[in-house]
Amino acid sequence: RNYAAFIEKYYPRIAGSSIIFPGGCEKAAGENGKQEAERNLRGAQDKKEYQISFIGTYTDYRSYLPLIRNSQGIIKKIAAHFLFRMKQHPEETAEKALEESLRKDGIVLSDEEFLEVLDGVKPMIYCIMSYYREKAVKVILEAGITLEVFGDSWKKSPFGDSPYLRIHEAVDMRESLEVMEKSLISFNVMA
């Protein structure tokens, strides 16, 4: 929903923005679909190939820090508050955190300028996203829960040698839908 709202606000010439659920290509129809989904969920744990899967890549959030330190202009001015806001309010979108950071510093931008600044804070967005990915994966693995991950980036993670981390070959978008279908839980951390 947040992506659709963003497109509708900043790119109004794109008609018919909508949410696209990553869980599959077909949606359940009405109450019958809901009842069917509930029936399918019962006993699903025994039928799923994976308990928990994570399609996202691993990037060390610390790798973004030099880019953030070297930021310029408005971006440098709002960097500390923006990062703090994103870390303290993970439920908020990056756009909301940016709006609040700009408001705190009394900076008023046109929509076009806002998009330029949003593009400029991407390293900060990726930093926080990677930070939360690392923390979430750590909690799962420390709990002794097996986590299925995809792609070689996980071999470089601090968890690469964990007996609970199963690293698979990278998957494309279509294959990721198949992984989700085979998973009891599939999670992601996004900005």
Language-model region placement:
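Nucleotide-sugar donor-binding catalytic core of glycosyltransferases
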Residues: 3-33, 46-191
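Short Gly/Ser/Thr- and charged-rich N-terminal loops/segments
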Residues: 38, 42-45
